[in-house]
Every structure is written in C-alpha cells, then in structure tokens.
Amino acid sequence: GAATIRWSGTFTVNFYGSYTPFWIVDPTLTVDAGGAARLTATIGGRGSSQENPDIQITLPDTPITLAEFADVYAGGAIASGWTAPTRYLGSNVTPPAGSPAQVGGVHKGAWPQSFVDFHGQTGTAAYWYSSGAAADPLKAQEPVGVHYSLNP
C-alpha cells in the first residue's frame, strides 16, 4: 500500500559550528505501493563563506528532499515500520556553481539534488556529495528507521 506520514516541528543543525546553521521544518515521508519512498521537508538556514565566515545571510525557506529510498518494505513490516538504506551510494548530483566536481569511486554518492543545491548557498555543498575529500567515506546517509502503529 501507499502511505504518507507527516511530522510537525522543526529541528536545527549547527553543522559547521555557528557559521552555517540550518533547520528542517515539518518533514513528510511518502511511500508508494512498490515501497519507493521520499522524505521531504522545508529547509531554511544561514549562508556564509570561508573567506568571511562572520558575515551570514538568512536564506529563504526552500522545499527539499532529504532522502530517497528504493524499497522500504524490504527492511521491515508494513504494519509496524522499517529500517532502510537511502539512495546515497551511486547517486549523481550536479554540484552548484563554484563547488568541486563530484567524483566516482567506491564512495561515490550524493544527498538529493535539492538538498545539495540549498547548501550551495550555505557554502557547504561539497560536504553532501563525493567530492574527492578525505571525508567522502563519512558522507553517506545512515539507514533510516521509521516505526509506527496502525490504528484502524
């Protein structure tokens, strides 16, 4: 079956100290009948640069995709929840202007394009895809678990 789960609320990530905080608002998980799923939300935050990190600009709220999944039903039970890997590994992305190119290899991957595009404005886009950095093995999303109970 198909399903939609919506959460109300906001969480903030101070990814690079206080220089480029961002926040995720009202995430929504949509699962189709075949088990493919997408986690979307609104993102907002502040942008900065390495050249002048003390100057921050407030970025407009933007709808984005946080994660995509191939088959969530393979990792659990429809009636109670699941844990599934994201589509990070092997995903292609077009880096925002001024960002390093995406590289291949065993750790090639990317967070969803809209998420990377938003972070082109924060100055941290290359943190969210394989860019050839030593940290590339650490950029992949961890498996996501969603657990619930169904009330008829």
Where is each model-derived feature located?
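Primarily mature extracellular domains of secreted and cell-surface proteins
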Residues: 1-152
